[in-house]
């Protein structure tokens, strides 16, 4: 299960977005089973945008690439989507983290293209509300625990298996943990 192409964020008690996104799902085997079709039918009946996928592992790694770069850069550099579209350190680190996920996905047997980060930034980022923000930045602003362990933590841990360095994810892990540690101060 994955969600795609969404820039939803919460402003007080209201959800704000330019792109509502869709739910992507499928069997690990890639087979389009009756179970997958039943989920698609149910979501259709509920009016929920969805995409049954024969390549769900690819979609999940792609989603990790986006979250790992976008969410962590927004949180670490205190930037909305519009700020991450601008050239500079935040965008450079976002891209570097995305590249680490692309390399790791390839080592894990999932062939994300080497320019997958650029494709996302060029195709999707312009559609996001410039004042919008991903969930991890919302967490930091609300002083809630973030998903840094699920993003940088997982990437760092899995990369160790291959002896792959992860300087961007190391930076994000350290920086976001520092931010979280400062919540009580």
Identify the residue ranges that each predicted region occupies.
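Residue-level detector of flexible, active-site-proximal loop/helix-junction positions
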Residues: 6, 57, 155
């Amino acid at each position: 299960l994955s969600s795609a192409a969404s820039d939803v964020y919460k402003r007080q008690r209201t959800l704000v977005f330019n792109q509502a996104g869709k739910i992507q799902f499928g069997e690990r085997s890639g087979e389009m089973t009756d179970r997958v079709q039943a989920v698609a039918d149910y979501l259709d009946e509920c009016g929920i945008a969805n995409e049954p996928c024969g390549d769900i592992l690819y979609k999940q790694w792609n989603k990790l690439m986006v979250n790992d770069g976008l969410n962590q850069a927004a949180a670490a550099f205190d930037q909305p989507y519009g700020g991450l579209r601008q050239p500079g350190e935040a965008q450079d680190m976002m891209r570097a983290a995305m590249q680490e996920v692309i390399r790791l996905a390839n080592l894990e047997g999932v062939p994300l293209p080497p320019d997958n980060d650029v494709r996302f930034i060029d195709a999707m980022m312009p559609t996001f509300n410039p004042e919008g923000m991903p969930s991890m930045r919302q967490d930091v602003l609300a002083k809630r625990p973030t998903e840094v362990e699920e993003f940088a933590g997982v990437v760092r841990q899995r990369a160790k298996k291959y002896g792959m360095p992860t300087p961007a994810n190391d930076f994000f892990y350290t920086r976001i943990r520092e931010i979280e540690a400062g919540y009580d101060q």
